[in-house]
Regions:
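Carbohydrate transferase catalytic cores enriched for Leloir-type hexosyltransferases
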Residues: 1-130
């Protein structure tokens, strides 16, 4: 299977739960899976060490505020590489509707739904819209 993973959290959220989870997910898959092919999206200039031959890094030029990358670039790259599954580990934030392959997210918590007063209005809107 050809699997794309949004690995931007490894760089952008390093030291947080989502950043640590994303890094450990990629590292663990690298250690145990020699059969599937992986395309890991990372911010331009970032890298992951000691990846096996079935892992490729796709550098992306985007920042936290841009959604052009999510809406246009990701779907095109996934199509160009015939990806069968795309995983977004950060609560599905940034998951474009324009993606043609199967999609998966990791939902870390539902605090914005259960206790909306504990999160910013901006995050609450993003969470509810996604």
């Amino acid at each position: 299977m050809k699997i794309g993973i949004d690995g931007r959290a490894v760089k952008w959220y390093r030291g947080t739960g989502i950043g640590t989870y994303t890094h450990q997910l990629i590292s663990s898959l690298n250690n145990v899976d020699k059969d599937n092919d992986y395309l890991i999206f990372l911010p331009d200039g970032s890298s992951l060490k000691n990846l096996n031959d079935n892992f490729r890094v796709e550098p992306v030029k985007a920042n936290l505020q841009e959604n052009f990358w999510d809406e246009v670039s990701v779907p095109n790259i996934l199509d160009d590489h015939s990806m069968e599954l795309y995983h977004v580990p950060q609560n599905g934030v940034g998951l474009s509707e324009n993606i043609n392959c199967l999609k998966a997210i990791t939902l870390h918590d539902i605090i914005p739904l259960r206790m909306p007063e504990t999160v910013s209005d901006r995050y609450l809107k993003i969470f509810n819209d996604e």
